[in-house]
Structures are given as C-alpha cells and as structure tokens.
UniProtKB/Swiss-Prot annotation:
Name used for this protein in its record: DNA-directed RNA polymerase subunit Rpo11
PROSITE patterns: RNA_POL_L_13KD
Family as reported in the entry's similarity comment: Belongs to the archaeal Rpo11/eukaryotic RPB11/RPC19 RNA polymerase subunit family.
Top-level taxon in the UniProt lineage: Archaea
Organism: Haloquadratum walsbyi (strain DSM 16790 / HBSQ001)
C-alpha cells in the first residue's frame, strides 16, 4: 500500500491509496463515517473518468465547526479498524 496526498485543506483531504481495492476502501470509508467530526467520506476508483480503473482516491471532508483535521480523522479511523480486527481475532480464537 502506498499513500499519496493529492489535495489537503483545513477541512478536506484527497489521498490516493495505491494497491487497494473496494474491500479495503469500503472498510476505511465506513470507519471514517463513524468518526467524530467527519461530514463525508467517499472513494472513487476512476476519478478522472479515464475509461479504466485507476488507484482508489479517498476523499474526506470534516465539519467546519468541529476543528478536526481530516488527516487526524483518517488516523483515528485507521486505529478503529485495527481495534475491530483485533477484537474479531480475539473472538475467533476464543471460539475455535
């Protein structure tokens, strides 16, 4: 996985997530939408309408009054995904 910031402002972030597909992008988007201060989170695998699939571009918009940096929100969402995976691993191990 390689990340490349395309655009960043106080309330918006667009970042390319090279090497990932819909599976991962849906998980991180879902975690972002549950993160405090995030107004919107989307991704596109064909942002330039090039006629073919490109690397996914994740777009995050935070609420202007929330004082949340979109990059910090992405970090929070990533940690939440890790916590969920750890919880699942523990539950799975206990079940088998």
């Amino acid at each position: 996985m390689e990340l490349r910031v395309i655009e960043r402002t106080d309330t918006e972030l667009r970042i390319e997530v090279a090497g990932e597909d819909h599976t991962f992008m849906n998980v991180i988007k879902g975690a972002l939408l549950q993160t405090d201060g995030v107004a919107a989170a989307t991704y596109d695998v064909n942002p330039e309408q090039s006629g073919g699939q490109t690397e996914p571009v994740l777009s995050i918009q935070t609420e202007p009054d929330a004082d949340v940096d979109p990059l910090d929100a992405l970090g929070d969402a990533s940690r939440q995904v890790q916590t969920t995976v750890d919880d699942f691993t523990s539950a799975f191990t206990a079940a088998v």
